[in-house]
Amino acid sequence: MAAQRLGKRVLSKLQSPSRARGPGGSPSGLQKRHARVTVKYDRRELQRRLDVEKWIDGRLEELYRGREADMPDEVNIDELLELDSEEERCRKIRGLLEACLNPTEDFVQELLAKLRGLHKQPGFPQPSPSDDPSLSPRQDPAHTAPP
């Protein structure tokens, strides 16, 4: 009998509304937090980027049909957008497609047109490996060989 009461008490505490609430005291705190994160970015821009990425993947599959091993691993949209001119973008894209035996000029021109409507993805600046002191040789006198 006492065990039943104890079991009911534990069960009722586990099912209490205060336990069901997420962070911030709201019942669906996790969902609301995700909603705030996605609202932070422009959904249209993200959708455009996704559409361009899907288009790139589809076209690369067409261009490299039967020679998938030669297909570039990635066409980095942000890397292309960081380049200063359309000529540089064109050279970069053509360089990625050097191994393609099919004509690529239509793909290059269409991709350049699609890139004109996109903006670089906002994010945290990526430090250069040369900026990281942990990657440079140690300058500790105890570990430096005498001249």
From Swiss-Prot:
The modification Phosphothreonine is found at residue 38. Gene3D superfamilies: CPI-17. Keywords: Cytoplasm, Phosphoprotein, Protein phosphatase inhibitor. One of its GO terms (biological process) is cellular response to xenobiotic stimulus. The keyword Nucleotide-binding does not apply. GO terms for molecular function: protein phosphatase inhibitor activity; protein serine/threonine phosphatase inhibitor activity. The keyword Lyase does not apply. It is found in: Cytoplasm. Signal peptide: none annotated. Residues 1-11 have a biased composition (Basic residues). Residues 35-120 are annotated as: Inhibitory. Residues 1-37, 118-147 are annotated as: Disordered. InterPro entries: CPI-17, CPI-17_sf. The modification Phosphoserine is found at residues 26, 128, 134, 136. GO terms for cellular component: cytoplasm. Its main location: cytoplasm. Inhibitor of PPP1CA. Has over 1000-fold higher inhibitory activity when phosphorylated, creating a molecular switch for regulating the phosphorylation status of PPP1CA substrates and smooth muscle contraction. Belongs to the PP1 inhibitor family. This is Protein phosphatase 1 regulatory subunit 14A. It comes from Rattus norvegicus.
